[in-house]
Amino acid sequence: MLPCDLLIPCGYYNQVVPRILYTAFDVVPSPKGASTHILHFLRGLVNSQFDVHLFTPGDGLLPSEDSIEGAKVTRVPQNLQDNFLARAVHFGGAVLAHVAVAQAYDIVHYRSLWGGFQLAQSKSRFGYKTIFEVNGLPSVELKYHYPGLEPDLLTKIKEQELASLHLSDAIICPSRVTRDYLASLGLDRKTVTVIPNGVSPSDFFPSPLPERINRVPVMLYIGTLADWQGLDVLIKSIPLIIEKHPIQLKIVGRGRSRQRKLLAKQIRKLGLEEHVIVQPPVPHHEVPALIAEADICVAPLGLNDRNVTQGACPIKVLEYMAAGRPLLASNMPIVRELVRDDIDGLLFSPNDPEDLARQALALLENLELSQRLAESAAERALSKFTWHEAQKRLGKVYEKLLENE
């Protein structure tokens, strides 16, 4: 009999340790939110006494065979000179080749089309159940990274996504907006389990707001430089803010060369070189200290199909909240699933630099308001949005699949 564990109740299995393959076309570990998500799901599965094998791409630095959180890790070598699609197709082929020779898996859990399409098609051949974890779909997101993609290619990708979704035994996603989008593609809403992202209270916890005397307040953005993040609107708001109150904007995150160049050009054009600092990403364990130095944290998500139609669950918002920082964020459904306006943060009209500036000034000029919002945000994030809770929800999905074997 397996011991009682985090996800599955005592006495559930008869001496058999379920074998799980977890695949993700994301480098792990890395500063990205996807890596944080994967590591916490991995920890929950291992703590439930599953035999877990994580399959990810390599980055040329991390070892090809490894162990994380007690799970075996295989990193598929990549030719980093190849384009994204070539690397994605190569990864999918490597995953399927592994399944063909590996000891049988009970559940195969995939986070993307890359590998997921082949694995969904092959489930009857190899006898496993499948979980499709939908955090983002290439048919929606790729055009923001690669604006020159042919429409026919995106159509083909969407067809493969639809096939993968309908072939999967279970689907999980991080927001109700995403669930509704999947339902619009013909899936039964009841078959999709929403598991929001979370925070770890041991890493993110409230600290006193910095003193504002004799110093320039810091507004912090942490995240990718992807076009859907709304950073152009954030930059446009800075001149409006500094007309009335000094501020320094610090942007910390990963971006492609094109994205960094566009951001730098906008900063120069507006003459904001002394007011805006752009820094490369930091390891995730350094994020709490960065947030602790900030006076305001911001998530300026843009009004676009990635955020409004497909949906997401921005980890940055939850981490800002848990760390007890005044939050500014776009007023859209994926944010309102996490944040109550004027209770846990101030929400501004998306794509509106004037409204963003107005809300930022309200926080800069009213310390009592900032403290009230920060305290409420921390309490909400640490009580309702933890990785422990996400792991429990994931466990129920696994339990249901294994019951039906």
Where are these regions (language model features)?
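A short, well-ordered alpha-helix in the C-terminal region of glycosyltransferases
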Residues: 355, 362, 369-384, 393-396
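Carbohydrate-associated surface elements
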Residues: 177, 198
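Conserved donor-binding/catalytic core segment of Leloir-type glycosyltransferases
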Residues: 21, 212-238, 250
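Short hydrophobic beta-strand element within catalytic cores of glycosyltransferases
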Residues: 297-299, 319-322, 326-329
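Membrane-proximal helix-turn-helix segments that form the acceptor-binding/catalytic region
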Residues: 96-102, 117, 121-125, 132, ...
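Conserved acidic donor-binding segment of nucleotide-sugar-dependent glycosyltransferases
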Residues: 317, 341-342, 346-353, 362-368
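Nucleotide-activated donor-binding/catalytic signature segment of Leloir-type glycosyltransferases, i.e.
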Residues: 261-289, 296
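Glycosyltransferase donor-sugar binding loop
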Residues: 60, 248-264
